[in-house]
Every structure is written in C-alpha cells, then in structure tokens.
Amino acid sequence: MTTTPQPPPQPDETPEGAAGAATAGRDPLEIAADLVDDVSRELDPAELASLERLDQPRRILFVHAHPDDESIGTGATMARYAEAGAGVVLLTATRGELGEVIPPELAHLDPDALAEHRTGELATAMEALGVSDHRFLTRPDGTGYRDSGMVWLEPGRAAAGDDVDPRSLAAADPEEVAARIAEVVREVRPQVVVTYEPGGGYGHPDHVRVHEATVRALVLAAGDGSRGAGGAVPWQVAKVYEIVQPERPVREALRRLAETGAEGAGDPEGPLPSVVVPDGEVTTVVDGTGQVPAKIAALRAHATQVTLDLDAAVPAMRLSNGVPQPVWPQEHYRLVHGVAGGPYDAEGRETDLFAGIAPSS
C-alpha cells in the first residue's frame, strides 16, 4: 500500500490561531495574569476602582454636608464598620467655609483659610475613626461647592441666611448636585447609604440640600445612565438610612443637664430639632460603646466647631450655639429604603446596618 505524501501543516494565521499558538505550553496562571492585564488596559480608572471595591463584601457610604458632621452624627458607626473591615466611604459636600469658629485665636480665618483648616481637621478625624476613603463632592468642572452658611433662629434650629453665595451648595442646581452624588454611588457601589433626615438635623440649608440630593441621586444611580450619573454601570443601593435620635432619651438627657445646672441646657419640655423623632420611628441602633474613644478623638480634631465637656453628669459636646448635646455611645437611624433584618435588640430595632443583605449584593 502506498500513500501520497502530505504537505506539512501550515500555521494558522487567523487571530484565533495566533492566540492559541501564543498560549500553547504556557503556565495557565501566566495566561490568566495576561488576560487581567488586558482587561485593565481596556477599562477606565473609575471602572477599575469599582471592581477593586467589590473585593470588600460590605460597603457603606456616608453623605454629609461639612467637615465635623460625620463625627458628630455617625462617628462611632463609621469607626465600628471600619474596624470590622467594611468598606467605609465618606462623601463631604463642602469644606465648611462659613462655619462659625469657636476658638478666639482662630476667629481671624477668612472663608478660604477656614476651609483649608477644616480640611486638615477632617483628615485628622478620619485617621481617628480608621477611615481612609474620603472625598469632597465637586462640580463637573472639578471645583467644589461652598458652604452656604446659616443663621440660628433659636437653640437647635437654623435656617439659610439672607445673603447666599452663588457658588454655594444651596444655590447650585439640585439636579447637578444629585448627579454628582450618583456618580460616587456608582463608583463606590455601596449596599448601604446614610445621610440626614428631611429637616437636615437642625435646619442647616446644606444639610437639607444633601438629604434632597442624595434621595434623588439614588434614583439616578439605579437608572439606565441616560440622565445623570455619568456612564458608569447602574447600581441599586439595598438600604438607605436617615440619622435620627429617639425623643425619650434626648429629653431625659436634657433634664439631667438642667438639673446639674449645665450652662445653655435646653428646655426638656420644649421643641426639639428635626433630628429628634418619636422613639417608634427609630428602626436601627448601632452600639458604638467600643468606638467612643475614636469618636471623641474625632470630635476633638474638629476644634474650630466643637468643644467637649466629658466630665459632666451627662458627657456632652457643644457647637457654636453653646447648647450641650449628649455624646451618645449608641447612634440611631431610621430605615427609609430596604428591608430590616435581625438580630434585633429588646425594643425590636436592628443592630446592624447591613442586616439582611447578602455579602455579594
């Protein structure tokens, strides 16, 4: 039997064939590494950052108005989750240019100098809380939103002043502000977002704007990208919380402060700021007892805005209005989006902001 000699096989010069030849006999791990490098070259930096954050199964975004707000309202919570290994991100809307300065020796600072000083205070506070991911909200051109300022109407209640800077957060296009927050949401991809209740805690116009813009931002972030939020992949936040305080403990603390003669103590039976809500509206309490030292260190860092009286019968902090506010070892929240989950405390409140959320969500 004879056979006809066959010509030697010709190399496959198609792209697929070339790729196969290039990988033949190579270590599979080396091939995988090259594939990852190729993906890295094709994705933009924001997309890569989003993928890297998914390595942290639990991610939480706090949206605040000024440096110091994060430590006052959510400092223990931030420290607790940072300590537990969650991805904790702080977004601050302004640099606090118009904050009322408490120390006389710093009263000379003009708005820009105060902003720089408060940025340094915030960096120190973040270090105390163990949080490394902080960013300021910016306009599309990269500039920041300025503090809108406020006036005190009465103890615990503020409002916008008569002369609002056109560069301020309160004067900005609300849809633009919401879209900028939505871009951060899509980048960070948090399961949980925390911000103010509709009254902004005590009426500060920047707090109110942050609440409104964050609510709108979450709608934009979950949308198809046709409006706002840039071109990043849509993201649906699982749970949204508002910062609140339960009325009964607040009034009890005010009574104790009044009984001890604390200067500036509010009326235990009088009106309260919007952050204080009926006890039954509090859905969640985060026990930050172990993080109180970190919270106090963060509050001390904001020396232009906060003074502390920790030796009083009720350990308290004071803002520029001089009214003592208890330094709580627990921080309270109201769930406004999502489903509550256990474990629950004796009063039926959640004890974990991530309760009920699967790590891969």
UniProtKB/Swiss-Prot annotation:
KW Hydrolase (keyword) present: yes
Binding locations of Zn(2+): H66, D69, H207
Pfam families reported for this sequence: PIG-L
Catalytic EC class: hydrolase
Ranges of compositional bias, category Pro residues: 1-12
Catalytic reactions on record: 1D-myo-inositol 2-acetamido-2-deoxy-alpha-D-glucopyranoside + H2O = 1D-myo-inositol 2-amino-2-deoxy-alpha-D-glucopyranoside + acetate
GO molecular function: N-acetylglucosaminylinositol deacetylase activity; zinc ion binding
Keyword terms of this UniProt record: Hydrolase, Metal-binding, Zinc
One GO BP: mycothiol biosynthetic process
Region Disordered, annotated ranges: 1-27
Cofactors (names): Zn(2+)
Start-end of Low complexity biased regions: 16-25
EC number: 3.5.1.103
Cofactor note: Binds 1 zinc ion per subunit.
Family per record: Belongs to the MshB deacetylase family.
Function as written in the Swiss-Prot or TrEMBL entry: Catalyzes the deacetylation of 1D-myo-inositol 2-acetamido-2-deoxy-alpha-D-glucopyranoside (GlcNAc-Ins) in the mycothiol biosynthesis pathway.
UniProt name for this protein: 1D-myo-inositol 2-acetamido-2-deoxy-alpha-D-glucopyranoside deacetylase
Top-level taxonomy: Bacteria, Bacillati, Actinomycetota, Actinomycetes, Kineosporiales
